[in-house]
Design a protein with these regions (language model features):
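Phosphate-binding site of ATP-dependent enzymes
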Residues: 143-234, 255
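C-terminal active-site "lid" helix and adjoining low-complexity regulatory extension at the edge
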Residues: 236-239, 248-285
Length: 285
């Protein structure tokens, strides 16, 4: 078992991570010494920690170059969880194409690089950057708002972003999303998440408002999410933690909306108490 662990956050996120009190309490019960540390605190000597765990560093999309440099610096002196290769894979949602090529069902997605015109499917659409977190700079548009969606794409392109265009699935308003949490590659627990994406606007906070609830995953949901985690494990190594967000597509099947390996909320507050203990165990050993 390790002796000392850094739980990595950022100043703006302090007090806003629902996982934090449950995770820290569970880690304390293992006997591990835990420090709550901002990732961009230059006074920190990361080599003093046996393990550094990314948790609520939610401002990284706005500081990506700095964050990337930090990943390598920490990884050079201690055990970073998840490792940089996994983090970098998950940073860019163009990984959805890789999942689709491997036969994992994904939300229908068109990737629009800077310099390319955007085209939209009939009906409502969602526009989001390929690199982002917490639904920041993501927005939904109605069937009569494609002009506004085009302007949104142009703004993201001007910032150098590849853009994802997805249909606004009929199931989203009624059912939301299902975050599926995996620890050491094995399914742990699930939740239900309903994200309030702005209508023809963008999120200007660390994350979009959410309404969350407990959820008992079905075998079909676990199968799809496990396929995504297995692909990552086979190609890059097994993530200590992973969250696969599922939605129901317009044919009624479950598909992957995203795979979060950077600093995902794990919805410990909506899971059985043993979930926090499982999380602490994989971090401590």
């Amino acid at each position: 078992m390790i002796g000392r662990l850094a739980w990595v956050t950022t100043q703006e996120a302090r007090g806003r991570d629902e996982d934090e009190p449950l995770g820290l309490a569970a880690l304390e019960r293992t006997g591990v010494s835990v420090d709550l540390v901002d990732w961009d605190d230059h006074a920190v000597d990361w080599s003093l920690f046996d393990r550094v765990v990314l948790r609520s560093a939610w401002d990284y999309p706005q500081r990506l170059d700095e964050f990337s440099t930090w990943l390598d610096a920490v990884d050079a002196v201690t055990d970073l969880v998840n490792p940089p290769a996994l983090v970098r894979w998950s940073l860019d949602k163009q990984y959805l194409a890789e999942l689709a090529e491997a036969g994992v069902p994904i939300t229908p997605t068109v990737f629009v690089p800077p310099g390319s015109p955007a085209s939209f499917p009939p009906g409502g659409v969602v526009v989001k950057p390929a690199v982002g977190a917490g639904s920041v700079d993501a927005a939904s548009y109605g069937a009569d708002q494609h002009e506004e969606a085009t302007s949104h794409v142009a703004r993201l392109h001007a910032a150098g972003q590849v853009v994802l265009v997805q249909p606004f699935l009929r199931s989203i308003p009624e059912e939301g999303e299902w975050p599926m949490v995996f620890l050491d590659g094995r399914f742990s627990h699930a939740a239900n998440k309903r994200v309030a994406l702005p209508q023809a606007g963008t999120v200007d906070d660390l994350f979009a408002p959410e309404t969350n609830a407990a959820h008992v995953a079905t075998a079909a949901q676990v199968e799809v999410a496990q396929a995504a985690v297995d692909l990552v494990s086979d190609r890059l190594g097994t993530p200590t933690y992973a969250r696969v967000d599922l939605v129901r597509d317009d044919t009624g099947g479950f598909c992957v909306l995203e795979v979060e390996l950077v600093e995902p909320s794990l919805f410990l507050a909506y899971a059985e108490p043993a979930a926090a203990e499982r999380f602490a165990a994989v971090l401590a050993h």
